[in-house]
Amino acid sequence: MSFDFDLFVIGAGSGGVRAARFAAGFGARVAVAESRYLGGTCVNVGCVPKKLLVYGAHFSEDFEQARAYGWSAGEAQFDWATLIGNKNREIQRLNGIYRNLLVNSGVTLLEGHARLLDAHSVEVDGQRFSAKHILVATGGWPQVPDIPGKEHAITSNEAFFLERLPRRVLVVGGGYIAVEFASIFNGLGAETTLLYRRDLFLRGFDRSVREHLRDELGKKGLDLQFNSDIARIDKQADGSLAATLKDGRVLEADCVFYATGRRPMLDDLGLENTAVKLTDKGFIAVDEHYQTSEPSILALGDVIGRVQLTPVALAEGMAVARRLFKPEEYRPVDYKLIPTAVFSLPNIGTVGLTEEEALSAGHKVKIFESRFRPMKLTLTDDQEKTLMKLVVDAHDDRVLGCHMVGAEAGEILQGIAVAMKAGATKQAFDETIGIHPTAAEEFVTLRTPTR
């Protein structure tokens, strides 16, 4: 049977574009359909614009700290419109880069909504195409709980396009997106409250990291309200919002921002026309090769719900392209030791097991931990402290986990992730000469276990 394409990719996000480009490079006839924006969540309403806003939010501290170093530039003023305008231009530039990457790779780009008609057919805005393989890489979408007044709330999708910076913001959620945006709004000068229905945010991260970040965010004036949740949202006559909590309290705000989870983007995808099955949580079920229950259809990225991170989707896209069209170069994605960062202020960087995970897995561990005031702040009144922590297997000396809260934690942990991937032991850390004076050298000078 002949097909229009060897591979038809639905979704031009990080994973879909990676799979399409490399499949085309391996000689396959490839098409990509995208209904919204090139680059997916990461480029448009995720990692990239968020990191730009994090940079913007940190300047208030930079200006204040500069005074201790002899700099005086008058009173700093922030303009939201300038930041958002410049951010938009950068995203448009990146959209163009993604377009060029696809076109220059020989990929057919179709801008429109794609819908599955059967196991080998896709319709894009009335046009029908056939493909030997179809890859679903449609990503995820933020969700807001079904409460009265939820139409007054926003998510990360809308936050990047607000016309003005809200004066008072309620951020609802306890995951990394909630913590990052609470840091952003707080750093830019908004009166910010973070509400979370449990006793401490960032479930799944090391307990020491969670508690340390809680304390540091509190120092910066962020109002943290745990064991709290919103029951309803009402719009006031003056346009402000009144959020009634489940305990009866009412909090007033100009913006209620929800970061309470994401769902797979499967709307009107036509899965009912195929044999594709979903998991209990609504993600597309796949095997170790990203194969769905329909032999000709594959899926990757956020839509399969494994590890919802851009670099993971990129690795999955590469694996799919190689397995289908260059099998001699195929290597499965290794989901162990995936480094992660949270771009809160201060940042979190982490790789490997938490202390709790190591103990649950039966490891006898030694914990090395240090909390210190970074050198940059010693001339200032800023009392922010950095946390560095190593979780070490007491039996074979292997470093099981590395965790940090502090400036540029993600940059530091990326390098350590390579060492841990190579099986680094605590002895290897001890024998490594540090770069002085840096914060990073603390990881190779931790000598005495704290427990």
Curated annotation (Swiss-Prot):
Cofactor note as given: Binds 1 FAD per subunit.
Q: Where along the chain is glutathione bound?
A: 14, 98
A biological process from GO: cell redox homeostasis
Cellular component GO terms, alphabetically?
A: cytoplasm
Sequence positions that bind NADP(+) = 174, 177, 180, 197, 203, 261, 341
**What residues does FAD bind to?**
14-15, 34, 41-42, 50, 114, 302, 310, 436
State its location(s).
Answer: Cytoplasm
Q: What is its main location?
A: cytoplasm
Q: Which domain of life is it from?
A: Bacteria
- Subunit architecture: Homodimer.
> Other remarks?
The active site is a redox-active disulfide bond.
| This protein's name | Glutathione reductase
What organism is this sequence from?
Pseudomonas aeruginosa (strain ATCC 15692 / DSM 22644 / CIP 104116 / JCM 14847 / LMG 12228 / 1C / PRS 101 / PAO1)
